[in-house]
């Protein structure tokens, strides 16, 4: 399984959209929001991470994997964090999952790795000042718990990446927007994490999708 993550507004969504159009299964109920040109988070995974953020980090408490998880409405459900993480794609149908919350607190990716070590990371990154500028342009209803300044985002990413290195989690990186115009390099990264597909087919899908997205920015 591949987890795609990044601090936000750094190309994770467009990467997922491309993978979906190539033919990779990214899970049920993963939707694209044209208003912000982003999406494709797997609800079951994002709910686990969102619940961790709400239950622990707002209160300064360490993650207890044997606590019961809350749903998006704050209601306890009959699953512990350990069970819920282990059940994500337990049948192996989903090839790639996206959620930016893995970068928010290093304890989140550590919690997942302590339960299951069957995933690799694709870490999308971007100039932090550009991330903040892009986030500030988003509608208020799409703001998130980590609506912070450049220094805080730099610290978040440093803490996250240090934890990835410490735990020796396999990873590859893509830098936004550079990777949008370098399909060969992007293809090589996807191959390295086990996302195999025909190069020519992928390039055709990629070029068409990237051209459409760039056209919307003009």
PLM feature segments, named:
Residues 28, 173, 199-201:
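A generic structural-conservation signal
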Residues 88-197:
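PAPS-dependent sulfotransferase catalytic domain
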Residues 84-86:
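Conserved alpha-helical scaffold flanking the Walker A/P-loop in AAA+ ATPase domains
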Residues 1-82, 204-216:
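PAPS-dependent sulfotransferase catalytic core
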Residues 32, 188-194, 214-218:
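Short, charged low-complexity intrinsically disordered segments located at boundaries
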Residues 31-34, 122-129, 202:
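A short, structured active-site edge motif that brings together acidic residues
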């Amino acid at each position: 399984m591949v987890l795609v993550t990044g601090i936000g507004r750094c190309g994770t969504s467009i990467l997922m959209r491309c993978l979906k159009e190539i033919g990779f299964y990214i899970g049920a109920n993963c939707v694209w929001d044209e208003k912000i040109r982003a999406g494709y988070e797997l609800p079951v995974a994002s709910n686990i991470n969102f619940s961790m953020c709400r239950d622990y980090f707002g209160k300064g408490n360490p993650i207890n994997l044997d606590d019961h998880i809350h749903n998006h409405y704050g209601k306890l459900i009959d699953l512990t964090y350990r069970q819920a993480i282990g059940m994500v794609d337990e049948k192996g149908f989903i090839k790639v999952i996206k959620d930016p919350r893995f970068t928010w607190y290093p304890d989140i990716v550590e919690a997942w790795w302590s339960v299951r070590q069957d995933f690799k990371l694709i870490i999308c990154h971007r100039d932090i000042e550009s991330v903040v500028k892009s986030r500030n342009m988003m509608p208020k209803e799409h703001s998130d718990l980590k609506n912070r300044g450049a220094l805080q985002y730099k610290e978040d990413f440093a803490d996250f990446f240090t934890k990835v290195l410490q735990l020796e989690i396999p990873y590859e990186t893509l830098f936004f927007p550079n990777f949008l115009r370098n399909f060969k390099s992007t293809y090589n990264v996807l191959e390295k994490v086990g996302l195999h597909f025909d190069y020519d087919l992928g390039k055709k899908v990629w070029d068409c999708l990237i051209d459409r997205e760039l056209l919307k920015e003009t």
